[in-house]
């Protein structure tokens, strides 16, 4: 059940990222054609593309984190025995969970502060850019919590992956 929910969320994020990238590409291409071909443009596309890019970066980071595609230095980890690797994984996941809390807290404050500041052309609240990091922080925290539970389970059962 939990694995299928995680798979569903992962697929939904992939589809959302693909959709955001496609929409961004269309908006930017349309604006370039209008500017250079017809000497006019749609000014709102720049703001919307910026907002979409921010959301794409944060949601893409969640996808990369979920699939262990982020950069990591494993020189020390690979030399440890499996139990030591599990302990180190637990410690690093706990530290990342603390960082996620700080990101969520700071981004939530910025979201609230900037909710009444509006973009000049589109009129969208500028707090939406900070809300992307809140959502990303929550999703990464959920991934970390499931990893921590799995690591604890394997450490205490003596079955270390």
Swiss-Prot record:
Its main location: membrane. GO terms for cellular component: plasma membrane. One of its GO terms (biological process) is C4-dicarboxylate transport. It is a multi-pass membrane protein. The chain crosses the membrane at residues 13-33, 51-71, 86-106, 135-155. Pfam families: DctQ. It is found in: Cell inner membrane. One of its GO terms (molecular function) is transmembrane transporter activity. InterPro entries: DctQ, TRAP_DctQ. The keyword Ribonucleoprotein does not apply. It comes from the Bacteria. Keywords: Cell inner membrane, Cell membrane, Membrane, Transmembrane, Transmembrane helix, Transport. Belongs to the TRAP transporter small permease family. This is Putative TRAP transporter small permease protein HI_1030. It comes from Haemophilus influenzae (strain ATCC 51907 / DSM 11121 / KW20 / Rd). The lineage of its organism: Bacteria, Pseudomonadati, Pseudomonadota, Gammaproteobacteria, Pasteurellales.
